[in-house]
From Swiss-Prot:
Molecular function (Gene Ontology), one example: hydrolase activity, acting on carbon-nitrogen (but not peptide) bonds, in linear amides
UniProt family annotation: Belongs to the PIGL family.
SUPFAM superfamilies in UniProt: LmbE-like (SSF102588)
Name of the featured protein: 2'-N-acetylparomamine deacetylase
Gene designation per UniProt: neoL
Keywords: Antibiotic biosynthesis, Hydrolase, Metal-binding, Transferase, Zinc
Enzyme's top EC category: hydrolase
Described purpose of this protein according to its UniProt entry: Deacetylase involved in the biosynthesis of neomycin by mediating 2 steps of the pathway. Deacetylates both 2'-N-acetylparomamine and 2'''-acetyl-6'''-hydroxyneomycin C.
Catalytic activity from the UniProt record: 2'-N-acetylparomamine + H2O = paromamine + acetate; 2'''-acetyl-6'''-hydroxyneomycin C + H2O = 6'''-deamino-6'''-hydroxyneomycin C + acetate
Amino acid sequence: MGEPTWEAAEDPDRTLRERLRRGRTLLVSPHPDDVAYSCGGLLAAVGRPAHATLLTVFTRSAWALPRRLRRAGARVVSERRREEELRYCRLRGLAEYRPLGFADAGLRGYDDETELSSPAEADGVRGAVEEAVAEAIRDAGADTVLAPAAVGGHVDHLLVHGAVRGAVGPGGPLTLFYEDLPYAGQRDAVDVERTLREARGLVPFASVDISGVVQQKVRGMYVYGSQTDDECVRETLRHARRGAPRRWTGGTAGAGHAAGRRGAPHTERVWTPAPAGAR
């Protein structure tokens, strides 16, 4: 596995794209659609990763936007979502798809409110998720791992975030965290920043300019037709237009470069754990 030595690059955006084009990448998604929503612009900008695996943790679900599909039940919904994942892998040139088969929060008894307010530590599936994610990271042999930052506090995202943080130690792959969408787009920008820096202990790694590929990102979102509506797309793009790079200051990785590229209409940010003692 590669050493995480790219953080000090003069142009972290370009360096990250080149890293994904040349190396082995593990894309960790709590549910089908999270990668497409949250870092699909980065993947579109990369073009075709050298070898990328999409690892989706909670792949059993009864939720879908179309009422007819919802009425068909969890087995049919889960199969539809698997088909959407495979189409997305083909669209983005991802080499492998690895579903872990866990039931999502809705099937575990959460409702719309409790899935966004419950601590991951109390969930009985936590240990099994941590074990499965750790095994998948070992098997992937990736030099870069992209995983959710758990912005928004969805219990499934918290479980996956914690599992990845626990699985990757010193000398492991470069581990980066994307801003969970559309959740980040539904929250005040200051609150998002506070969650990332204070609650998660992360610092900026790169602000990826996706302006030239934003329509490709949207196309990838609509691959997940069972989940994606126009409101979701609007929230996602609104977050990308917030101009977040101009707020980055100080001695964090990528901050100077991002601040210098003012006015990029659409961006995706990725974060990395703060150095020990930096919080």
